[in-house]
Regions:
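Feature for soluble, non-membrane regions of globular proteins
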Residues: 1-176
Length: 176
């Protein structure tokens, strides 16, 4: 089964001025597409050839895992963003965040601090734990909560390609 680049849920310029059209053209159109192309080149004739993307991520290793996980992580990331969105959550998520950090503002501070300190390339996630609590988890490279008992709720891509065009080496500015 050939995998395809999922469409963005918004136009390439919809996240400006926070994330520019140029960044999305490279990040989505080049990096994300390359992971799709690489995966499609790696899986023919393997046990992964006819599996769903999530199953490939959960069952593979090496290059197949890296490319499949990066497709999944990026798709989740694009769907974590929206034009003219943001603000504090409501309901059970707000309750869980307040129970852990005391306030949404304190959560944002903790999330940004964790993401800024995530060494090298990787991802910072808000996850729901098996006991229903929430936590912030940093992963390196292509690692993803999809391979753990944690349920991803939100992610931020902290690979340099996610922010370098717009923010150069100022990861904290990107996180704002």
């Amino acid at each position: 089964m050939a995998h395809t680049l999922p469409p963005l849920p918004y136009e390439l310029d919809a996240l400006a001025p926070h994330i520019s059209k140029e960044t999305l053209e490279f990040h989505y159109g080049k990096h994300h597409q390359t992971y799709v192309t690489n995966l499609n080149n790696l899986i023919p004739g393997t046990e992964f050839e006819n599996l769903s993307l999530e199953d490939i991520v959960k069952k593979s290793s090496g290059g197949i895992f890296n490319n499949a996980a990066q497709i999944w992580n990026h798709t989740f990331y694009w769907n974590s963003l929206a034009p003219k969105a943001g603000g504090a959550p409501t309901g059970k998520l707000a309750d869980a965040i307040n129970a852990k950090w005391g306030s949404f503002d304190a959560f944002k501070e903790a999330f940004n601090k964790s993401a800024a300190g995530n060494f090298g390339s990787g991802w910072t996630w808000l996850v729901k734990k098996a006991d229903g609590s929430v936590d912030i988890v940093n992963t390196s490279n292509a690692a993803t909560p999809l391979t753990t008992a944690d349920k991803p709720l939100l992610t931020c891509d902290v690979w340099e390609h996610a922010f370098y065009i717009d923010y150069r080496n100022a990861r904290p500015k990107y996180l704002e």
